[in-house]
Amino acid sequence: MFTSPRLLVPLLLASCWVGWPVTSHGTTIDLDRLIRCLEAREGARWASPGGALQFTKATWSELSSDPYLRASQPDKARQIARKALFLTIQRMERDGIRPTVWLLALRWNCGYSGMLARRLEPWSYAENVHNLYYDNDFR
């Protein structure tokens, strides 16, 4: 069965927004679990500027047409976080980089160019998120 790339991209974007796991290079990354780990690592309250995921105004504006105040609303912020992570995975694949939880956490903390510059260095933020992702039981 032939699937047009024009149909495939919206389907993939929709899958990331509804919370389905994303598979890249044979590795499945559960974006909802990763977002929970990012929330835990950031340690901010939802009522704080940028919400629990600590969006900057610039990042929020790149990803959403909604007002920055919506970054403090959990459902909307998680939707935009899934979009950000999914777009990062796509960009990494285009750049020949195999996406991992550690690299996605590094990108969340440092931005894409920061991730590229630091991806071969130890980075406690990324290590902490990686450990939460694989070792924490979110019950």
Q: Where do the model's predicted regions map?
A:
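Bacterial N-terminal signal peptides that target proteins for export
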Residues: 1-9
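Boundary at the C-terminal end of the N-terminal hydrophobic targeting segment
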Residues: 21-26
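Short, functionally critical alpha-helical segments immediately adjacent to catalytic or ligand/cofactor-binding
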Residues: 28-45, 81-82, 103-112
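Alpha-helical segment that forms one wall of the substrate-binding/catalytic cleft
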Residues: 62-103, 107-115, 130-132
